[in-house]
């Protein structure tokens, strides 16, 4: 029996590519099911991505499911210098 061991970066990339395709908020349990891992492991991957700023978590509310979503890519703002006359 071959055990499929992926690195942390491979797991995170898999999460990002899968959920950028469906483009809707997702639950930890959905990530766990997609990756074939426990909810605890999925939460670990999601928290790593959150720390990197690649995804964001819904505000924590008592009794509500945590939803995750891909962070919007923000472009750096362009500064223009004013030239004095």
From Swiss-Prot:
This protein's UniProt keywords: Plasmid, Transcription, Transcription regulation
What InterPro entries does UniProt report for this protein, alphabetically?
Answer: FaeA, WH-like_DNA-bd_sf, WH_DNA-bd_sf
Q: Does the keyword Transcription regulation apply?
A: yes
SUPFAM superfamilies named among the record's database cross-references: Winged helix' DNA-binding domain
Please give the biological process terms from Gene Ontology that the record holds.
regulation of DNA-templated transcription
Kindly give the Pfam families that the UniProt entry links to this protein.
FaeA
Superkingdom of this protein's organism? Bacteria
Q: Do you know which Gene3D superfamilies this protein is assigned to?
A: Winged helix-like DNA-binding domain superfamily/Winged helix DNA-binding domain
What family, per the record? To E.coli PapI and DaaF.
Q: What is the role of the protein in this entry?
A: May have a possible regulatory function on the expression of the other AFA-III genes.
Name of the protein in its database record? Dr hemagglutinin AFA-III operon regulatory protein AfaF
Species assigned in the record: Escherichia coli
């Amino acid at each position: 029996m071959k055990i499929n061991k992926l690195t942390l970066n491979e797991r995170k990339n898999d999460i990002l590519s899968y959920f950028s395709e469906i483009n809707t908020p997702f639950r930890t349990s959905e990530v766990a099911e997609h990756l074939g891992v426990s909810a605890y492991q999925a939460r670990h991957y999601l928290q790593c991505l959150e720390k990197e700023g690649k995804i964001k978590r819904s505000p924590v509310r008592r009794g509500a499911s945590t939803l995750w979503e891909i962070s919007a890519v923000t472009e750096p703002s362009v500064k223009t210098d004013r030239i004095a006359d």
